[in-house]
Every structure is written in structure tokens, then in C-alpha cells.
Amino acid sequence: MAQRFYLLLLLLIFLVNLICFSSQQDLSFVFNGFNQDQAGDELLLDGFARIQSPERVLQLTDGTTQQKGHAFFNRPFDFGSASSQSLSFFTQFVCALVPKPGFYGGHGIAFVLSSAHNLKKAYASSYLGLFNRSTNGSPSSHVLAVELDTVQSAETDDMDNNHVGIDENRIQSVVSASASYYSDREGKNISLILLSGDPIQVWVDYEDTLLNVTLAPLRNQKPSKPLLSRTINLTAIFPDRKAFVGFSAATGSSISNQYILGWSFSRSRRLLKSLDISELSTVPLFTEQKRKRSPLLIVLLVILTLVVIGGLGGYYLYRRKKYAEVREPWEKEYGPLRYSYESLYKATKGFNKDGRLGKGGFGEVYKGSLPLVGDIAVKRLSHNAEQGMKQFVAEVVTMGSLQHKNLVPLLGYCRRKGELLLVSKYMEGGSVDQYLFNGDKPPLSWSQRLAILRDIASALCYLHTGASQVVLHRDIKASNVMFDDHGANLSATAAVGTIGYMALELISTGTSTKTDVYAFGAFMLEVTCGRRPFDPEMPVEKRHLVKWVCECWRKHSLVDAIDTRLRDKFTLGEVEMVLKLGLLCTSIIPESRPNMEKVMQYINRDQALPDFSPDTPGIGVSTPMVMGIPGLAITSTSVTSSASVPLVSPPSTNNSMFISHTILNGDGR
């Protein structure tokens, strides 16, 4: 009796296992095309996914951006009690990825095993409708996918824009390869374009923990070698031992229609039914949905169009007035040197006050930046008189042709009604007066100071004798001599600076050069003594620098006039020569001043100074009224003018106007 009971119990256990095994074996199906009656009941669709009739295809996405679609078999694939080694499944499907004509589409399609069929929270685009940023890479995602990806994304570490990959719980593939298939006839892999619109066969086989992915064109037999192979523990990804099988597809900014033409699935290789290629539908052509526009919408579009046209017309008139310029036929010959007002307006950010470099008697200077040119300085000058403008522009252009290693040429000009704009290169270094009078700058060595003087003398000599016509500077002072490169390497190289760069003052031609010689002499004393030409804070006897230096010479103590910050680190003979030359250049008798060619010879020690003393007439006189010479002025800016030539010419019709230039390089002496 007991023996019979045990036999019945064993038989019952066998029948239960047989039923379970049979239920697992039953998960086999084939769709040789999709129709609404059969596939509509057996597939779970979401997103855009739909069965398209009468084409009998499963469409996952349409021709719109940021779209996704999912299609899963309505019953999960139940692993049962099978071990990971004995677990297996086999599937074959035919897909087609059809781009919009003339465009490159995306993003791709994936065969999916997922613990849940609801992936509505997943992202489209490069996530292929499988993950979002929070689920991507999470073990709780429980997703295994074989992706056919047609867009290369840096975010997902894609190898190219035409690859196949295996994804485990993340969109970044654990293994991938460029799409191709093995040709048994040729014995090599042949490239396959996924986004061609042509049908492609895909086989995904999982057996003995090995997942193989194989591709081939529609009419080819299954190749003997897979494209991808990967050992995968399926039960580790799906601990509850169940998974839905199906497809996911997505578009991003690039679009395509993505279709499944047929699908076969089985847990057994032997029971897997091959697709009947002859029964599959052809790939539908790419069509965009046509939407009917209501009359109201048409009216609104017309009104909107008129509003836009009116707005654009108003904006055009506003811009035309805002950027209006004055152009005359005679200016055509200067065309290459003329800048548009709009370009200068934008370069200076609307002449923003934050970019203002300085303000002088004739206008303001702004910093700007032009493409292919770099940083510039733009001087805005008021000029209401049209008479003489042609001569003025001609001379400005002539000034732009000056070339000297210590001069930056004028880049160009622009003019509007009542306004003239002059453009020159911008040099970023600080001015000499900042190094002489500000404590936050390192003091200049004597060799640097001498190099500055030699460079400026060279530039002035060129303006007076080397150009096609005599050019006066008439605003030489420490604040107008600037260092390039923020004064970098001052200890190793000569100072680099500018003449009149910050002020961009106007100059004249064809008149006496002695005004520049006087100004240069005052500048020599300023650089050597480290003092301003006129300092009201000093004692009366030291207030005028020219007079005080002459008095030191008279007392045989020129060394007392030298900048104390030099700390005896100078050549006494050089310093005394510079101080005496400065006094000679500042003689209030113009005929007694040397020309700049002579100054160059003196300062370079090519010729000795002429004999003169502190008591020589015109030497060391700080005010012109002592000599009774009317019209001669010596200002606190260390610049003088002769009676026949005013120091700074007012903007009149009889005055030629030029922009000053920039010293580029010292010679390191």
C-alpha cells in the first residue's frame, strides 16, 4: 500500500513538471507580417507604435522628432526553474529603418527583454526609449537589449552612427560593432547600412549563457558567424525569472520611420519557425502626415506675416537711422580704409562707458575689438564743419600710411553727420607716467628709461624727416607713452610705448618742428628726474622742473635732480648728457633747439653736445614772459608751441588734422 502511494506521488510530481515544461515550450510564435486581428490581440503597444494596414507592418515611430514607440508580446517569457546554463531563447525578425528623403534619420531600434512592458518614462533620442537618466545604469532597470543604433552620441559612448550593440541595464553597450554581416561565400564581413530603408534580417540566439547577434540582408541565408557574441547571466539581470520580449524605437532631432516586417520567437532552436520572406510586406515609402489647415488658421498666419513684415520694416528703418553714415563720391578712393559705423558700434559694444579709455578736448576714446584685427581704439570727434573735410580725410589716410617700427599706423576712419571716428590699434600696457608716479608699478631702470627716450626720438625723427611730409606730434608726455604687453619683461627689454595713444590728439603738418623738440626735451627731464614738468605741491624753487634742473647744473649738482629710485644704478655721464640735452631742447628760443636728427645723434652718443651753460640765453627759463616773446606757452603737460603754431589746433576748416601713433618696440638698450 505504501509502495503504491509513493508511486502515485512520483507520477504526480512528474506530471506537474511536464505541465510546467510544456507551458514554457508553448512560448513560441511567428508573425509573417502583422494584421490587426491576430497581432492586435497578442501585442502590447504604446507610444507611437501601431499596426499599419493594409501594409501589414508594425510601425514603431513616424516622421516626427523626439518620438518613441514600444511593442511587446502580451505574455512574459517565464524562465521557470531552468538554470542559467540550460536557459535559452531564439528569435528572428526583419526590420527596416527608413530616413526622410534628403535627411539623415535616427535614432534606432532595439530588440528588448524587460521585466516590465511599460517604458513610458524612458527617454527618446539616444536612449532609444529604453531608459531615462535615473534608470540608466541602475540594476533595478532589468533590461537586456540588442540595439541597432544610427546616431553617434557622445553621451552614450557610441562608436559610430551605424552600429549594433548589446546593452545590459544601461544604454552604453557592453559590446558593439559596426553593422555588417559575414559572407560565407567571400569569407569576410561585409558592411551593412542600417539606415538604408532596406529590410534587414536579425537573429538573436541565447544558449548556454552565450548571446549571439547575427545580421544579413533580406534574401540571404543566416551567416555561419555572428556579428556579436557575449556571455550573459540572464538570471542575474532578471532575478524574478520573467521578462517581456519585444521592440523599442526612438527618434530625436533626426527622424525616420522604423518598421518590423516579421517576427519569430521560441525558447527552442528546434521549434523556432523561420520567417516566410515571401509573405512579408514591402517597406512603406516615407510619407509625412498632411494636416488640414482651417480658414481661421490661415487668416491668423496672414496677420502674423503682415505683423512680422511690418516689424522687420520698422527695424530696418531704425537700423538705417541708427547706423547712418555720410558718404561722398570723393571718398571712394579711401574705401579700404573706411569702416562702417555699425562695425565700430558693435566693436565698442555701443560705445559703452565701461570701455572708455579717456576723454580729451576733442572727443572720447573707446576700446573695441574687430574680427581679424583684434583690439582697437576708436576716437569720436565732433566735427560739424563740412568745409575742409576732404583735405582732413586725405591727411588722415596719409597718416595711416606712415610706417616705422615705433609707430602703429592708423587703421581707418568713419564719419557721420557732425561726427568723425578714427580707428587705430589698441596697446594694452600701462603708460610711462604710471611707472614714474604710481607706487604700484615697479620703478624703471636707467637702461629702460634711456631706451624709451631713444625710441621716441627715433619715432619723432621719422615724423619730421622720414615721412613724405613733415608731421608734428605736439602732445608728447609721459601719459601718452605706453608699454605694450602690460609692461612684460621690462627688466630684460626696452620699454615699448606709444606716442599720443591714449589721447589720440590731433596734429598739423607743414609747420615748425621745434614744438615737438621742446616737448621731447621736457619729457627727457620728466623720465630722468621722475617728476612731472610742473608740480604745484613742490616748493617754489622746485615747482618748475626745467628751471630746477638748470639750477642744479648751475650749482654743479646735476645728480640731485636724478630720480632717487635709480639708487646710483646708472652711468653718470649718460644721465648728465640726457639732462643737458633736455635743457637744450627746452630752450625758449626755438632757433636754439636742435632738430630731431641732431637729438638722435646726441642721445645715441654719436656726437657730443654743443657748448652751452646754465647761463646761456633761453636755457632753464620756465616762463616765456621772461624773454618777452609773446604767444609762446609752456604748459604743465610739458608741451610748448611757437607763436606761429598753436599747441593744440582747434577743429577749424583751415587746420589739417592727424591722429597720433603708437610706439611698438624698444630696442633693449
Curated annotation (Swiss-Prot):
Gene3D superfamilies: 2.60.120.200, Phosphorylase Kinase, domain 1, Transferase(Phosphotransferase) domain 1
Bilayer disposition of the protein: Single-pass type I membrane protein
Mutant lacking the gene: phenotype: Increased susceptibility to the fungus Alternaria brassicicola.
CDD domains: lectin_legume_LecRK_Arcelin_ConA (cd06899)
An example Gene Ontology biological process: defense response to fungus
Side Cytoplasmic, residues: 317-669
Segments traversing the membrane: 296-316
Domain Protein kinase: start-end pairs: 351-609
InterPro entries (UniProt xref): ConA-like_dom_sf (IPR013320), Kinase-like_dom_sf (IPR011009), L-type_Lectin-RKs (IPR050528), Legume_lectin_dom (IPR001220), Prot_kinase_dom (IPR000719), Protein_kinase_ATP_BS (IPR017441), Ser-Thr/Tyr_kinase_cat_dom (IPR001245), Ser/Thr_kinase_AS (IPR008271)
GO cellular component: plasma membrane
Uppermost EC category: transferase
EC number of the protein: 2.7.11.1
Active site (record annotation): 475
All ranges on the Extracellular side of the membrane: 25-295
UniProt-annotated glycosylation sites, renumbered to this chain: 132, 189, 212, 233
Keywords, alphabetical: ATP-binding, Cell membrane, Glycoprotein, Kinase, Lectin, Membrane, Nucleotide-binding, Plant defense, Receptor, Serine/threonine-protein kinase, Signal, Transferase, Transmembrane, Transmembrane helix
Family: In the C-terminal section; belongs to the protein kinase superfamily. Ser/Thr protein kinase family.
Protein name: Probable L-type lectin-domain containing receptor kinase I.2
Organism: Arabidopsis thaliana (Mouse-ear cress)
Lineage: Eukaryota, Viridiplantae, Streptophyta, Embryophyta, Tracheophyta
Gene, per the UniProt record: LECRK12
